[in-house]
Regions:
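Conserved lysine of the Walker
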Residues: 15
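ATP-dependent small-molecule kinase phosphotransfer cores
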Residues: 28-98, 136
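ATP-dependent NMP and nucleoside kinases share a basic, alpha-helical "lid"
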Residues: 76-128
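Short, well-ordered beta-strand core segments
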Residues: 30, 109, 160-163
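P-loop (Walker A) phosphate-binding loop of NTP-binding proteins
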Residues: 10
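Small-molecule kinase domains that catalyze NTP-dependent phosphoryl transfer to phosphate-bearing small molecules
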Residues: 67, 128-174
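Hydrophobic positions on the alpha1 helix immediately C-terminal to the Walker A/P-loop
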Residues: 18
């Protein structure tokens, strides 16, 4: 049976950094939930801004059900035939509950967080269509996402929380400690 790590957290917290670390160091198969939505937006000929991605996600969820993307993630993991997988960017309650129900005790949900100012500095360095231009824009985007996805409640589903406000070495050490504690390494 697969060992799966699910990553939750606000934008710029370090979810993708952790996912890439697990993929590169330990061979975890990586599924990025946002990339699934970006693929669908591009197939429709749309520029994948944050607003467009939210609209595309909403369209597919209303058409195919709240668990559409979670089931797609499970399918990708199963098709990969990998023993270990990491899911980057779970946003909705179903994104967490459906894989938890499917993988049972073989899934570990980690919340990666950091202070807002640090997260804004991190995302300011990104070259993506959906990156906010100002700190106020960033905070407004975050308020919108917390409201749309009910993130406060989603984040409560985490088994462990990591505050990522230091360097990469500290982050990786903390990730390794937690994964060892749960028998995932």
């Amino acid at each position: 049976m697969n060992k799966v790590i699910g990553l939750l957290g606000p934008i710029g917290s370090g979810k993708t950094t952790v996912a890439k670390y697990l993929s590169e160091k330990y061979g975890f198969f990586m599924v990025v939930m946002g990339d699934l939505v970006r693929e669908l937006a591009r197939k429709k000929g749309l520029t994948p801004t944050r607003e467009v991605l939210q609209a595309v996600q909403k369209e597919y969820v209303s058409k195919y059900g709240m668990d559409y993307f979670a089931k797609l993630v499970i399918k990708r993991i199963e098709e990969s035939k990998s023993e270990k997988a990491v899911i980057d960017g779970m946003r909705r309650m179903e994104d967490v509950l459906v894989p938890k129900n499917y993988f049972k005790e073989n899934i570990l949900i980690l919340l990666i967080d950091a202070p807002a100012k640090i997260r804004y500095e991190r995302i300011s360095k990104r070259i993506r269509e959906d990156t906010p231009k100002t700190y106020d824009e960033f905070l407004e985007q975050e308020r919108r996402e917390y409201s749309i996805f009910n993130l406060d409640e989603v984040f409560k589903l985490a088994d462990e929380k990591i505050i990522n406000d230091s360097d990469l070495e500290t982050l990786y050490k903390r990730v390794d400690e937690i994964l060892r504690k749960y028998g995932f390494l």
